Amino acid sequence: MQISDTGHSHMPDFHAVLAREDWQNQTITHLNRLPAHPAFASWRDELAARDNHLSTRRRQLDGEWQFVYARSPFAVDAQWLTQDLPDSRGTPVPSNWQMEGYDAPIYTNVRYPIDTTPPRVPEDNPTGCYSLHFTVEDTWRENGQTQIIFDGVNSAFHLWCNGVWVGYSQDSRLPAAFDLSPFLRPGDNRLCVMVMRWSAGSWLEDQDMWRMSGIFRSVWLLNKPQQRLCDVQLTPALDALYRDGTLQVQATVEATEAALAGLSVGVSLWRGEEQVAAGRQPLGTPAVDERGHYAERVDFALAVTAPAHWSAETPNCYRAVVTLWRGDELLEAEAWDIGFRRIEIADGLLRLNGKPLLIRGVNRHEHHYLRGQVVTEADMVQDILLMKQNNFNAVRCSHYPNAPRWYELCNRYGLYVVDEANIETHGMVPMNRLSDDPAWLPAFSARVTRMVQSNRNHPCIIIWSLGNESGGGGNHEALYHWLKRNDPSRPVQYEGGGADTTATDIICPMYARVERDQPIPAVPKWGIKKWISLPGEQRPLILCEYAHAMGNSLGNFADYWQAFREYPRLQGGFIWDWADQAIRKIFDDGSVGWAYGGDFGDKPNDRQFCMNGLVFPDRTPHPSLVEAKHAQQYFQFTLLSTSPLRVRITSEYLFRPTDNEVVRWQVQSAGETLYHGNLTLALPPEGSDEITLLDSLILPEGARAVWLTLEVTQPRATDWSEADHRVAWQQFPLPAPLALPAPTVPAGAPDLIVSDEVWQIRAGSQCWTIDRRTGLLSRWSVGGQEQLLTPLRDQFIRAPLDNDIGVSEVERIDPNAWVERWKSAGLYDLEAHCVQCDAQRLANETLVDCRWHYLRGEEVVIVSHWRMHFTADGTLRLAVDGERAETLPPLPRVGLHFQVADQQAPVSWLGLGPHENYPDRRSSACFARWEQPLAAMTTPYIFPTENGLRCDTQALDWGRWHVSGHFHFSVQPWSTRQLMETDHWHKMQAEDGVWITLDGLHMGVGGDDSWTPSVLPQWLLSQTRWQYEFFLRCL
């Protein structure tokens, strides 16, 4: 590649640059931008490159820049090129200007935030003008090429240096480099960057995220020598036996034609300080056609005997140092971490190093609750550690290439990455309007090809993605074939275009169900088990998005993982998504809380649909993260027999033995430990072992609720976890003796005191009062102190979950959403009429028999019958049966609730825990005796909803209150009504007491998606009759 001397006397002036309106033209993806290439540092010492020392030729320009905000590019004063304007002020780079007090962030999912008129964008186009004064060393200015590199600018920008226009770039998510050499001068230099919020590129950036602007990634200066490496492609490969390796090297040099002949390129491969291979070759390739060869390029290979393989389990990295020489003079060194691995699709399976992968994946946006889309290395490491600790092995860069440092960290810690082009046109009608338009091919092409040219050297990237939700069209087809030709070492995936698209090597649907078909016109989504069995379909299936984790969600998740393990070609998927995309905000009333769409006056907006995370914005886990961790765990357990007590443990690690794992086990009866033990787990990859825990299981008389609990922990700390980290666990119920002790019935019955208004029942210090008109147990005093703040009442509703609410486009009502069906049925406004309230004192109890009709208008839709059995020891046995009209939809819950005074005591229970769990999301919960502070019994979902349930409980103790039976429960300082009527968690107000909710039945939460009713039939309360029973005491 020949260097040309670039003068700038012909450069256009400020107004001429703006008059072109380059940002309105989809065919202009850049002007004067340098070709894409891997990250460079331009070391001048080979060992410094090997050891990744800071390069003296690379300088970061992050820090405080001057900033001026304008309503459009044409509102900017041309004087800005030479001096700061009066209204300029300091702003950090990187940053989004919306997070610095300018303009408003906008959250939309599908809809474009501007009128859909591609390629044109509004004339009123918020514009940020950044300026910086800097100096460069004389040696930089006098020798070689000095580049400026912007790692990410949203959405397009013009660049000036010392008042002279340098160039233009769009594509918010890939580095843009320019040659500054012709524009630099001794001493002070002034850099000016004009960033437009909207550009023709915005039509390709309609991702489900906050729309923000500015220089949001780092800015660098890089000094390269006069003769320099301008591209290096490294392709490590393994042979057919996955034993020996080859490092394919293609390097391109930029130099004058005269200088090329004396140059050579060297490569050395290092593992730590050990050099494992090296080679050097003069520039020039063999002839490629009748016109000759590439004089500026070199292609050669290094043979590596039995290299350590790279995988997410064993991220063995080598350091490849590529050097440019003039004779024996080292001109420059560049270096990258590489890994030897072979990714391929064979026999219908995605394989790494010959082994079929099981993708334990999650989608991740770059988002920080204070900095917007600015993420630091510490943020990245925090995410990676949490992912690894929770059994994730893969991440999809949704839906754009990430900051360069992200890939380096994934290489080192071990995560498989799907790198995705910054292309989404979800808001177009039809969606493929641009992807099938040849006029947009240059824009599509730049985003895909530059992604590959920038990131291909990273071993963590195992799949390229052509983008997201852009329909199917000729542009995708063309780029699929370009990818297959230019990087045959990786498969390509693309979901757009539906079931029959040919632009993908992997079936990668989003939100396909395990069993149920979704016959959507043009793009049907079959049940995943059916999909892989369709005639002629031989590709693996990996869900690019599934398990929509919005709020209280992730029901049915274990069903997916059962299918993945049963059907080899179902190779996992990527949960949507990692973190709630909320922003910390000081609201108008001075309160501080999490903000979502609409909270900044942004229109249009899709409200809370930006909060679909397994973790809160500050990375505090949701309970659903524990469910994901358990379903994805690398060990499977099978109970072989109970006496002797034998289990089989199978490792799903493909590449590493269990050299840091211990099995801890215990047998418990009603939460009390009977037997326990530890043993070292020594399994080869994919190995299993059958273990005898007890030669004979002998249970004491009266044993009940007997469970075997096994967990696998890692006694030693790892790169991503602390010592004693728990990686897997499982419980099995064990048979208990059939004979149970007969319940004791206290002699005598409580006194029954009758008046016209109430039944009053007394037993020692206990006194219960039932209102004869309403039938409600309205008072319960102990030693003269009243315990109830509200009566005990039936509870048939829950504060709607996001999954109950349905569609994200909040102005459109979906009559099929559960909340709309419940509203239409009048479930939230039922009137209770007591039609029976009888009392009698029997030999050993006093019985109050009450029946209520719940009316929708004049129609009886629910009948509830309570039998309250009061005994002399102060116990209330409450037996409830009921029925609903067949015209009602399935109910969200069947139970009761009441408010009591705060006990200032921890909550203890015998049941599933310790975390929140629901009938269709409880595989990760264990049956035991648990104790937690009251605050831990609430999950503060940002959009308040039903939360905090614990299922399959046999006993509950909180302060004076004791409940036994078989039930689900929650104990919280919030009423269902307040949860329903509040739209942000920080607005929740303290109430006088604490609400106890006891459910006989509770509907599942769903979560296959959040816009259709996704609760599976087995988790719906479809029955029209029910009964349950509790024992309550207040001591």
Curated annotation (Swiss-Prot):
Active site residues of this protein: 469 (proton donor), 545 (nucleophile)
Reactions this protein catalyses: Hydrolysis of terminal non-reducing beta-D-galactose residues in beta-D-galactosides
Site positions for Transition state stabilizer: 365, 399
Protein name: Beta-galactosidase
Organism: Klebsiella pneumoniae (strain 342)
EC number(s) on file: 3.2.1.23
Cofactor(s) annotated in UniProt: Mg(2+); Na(+)
Cofactor binding description: Binds 2 magnesium ions per monomer. Binds 1 sodium ion per monomer.
Binding, substrate: 109, 208, 469, 545-548, 612, 1011
GO cellular component, one term: beta-galactosidase complex
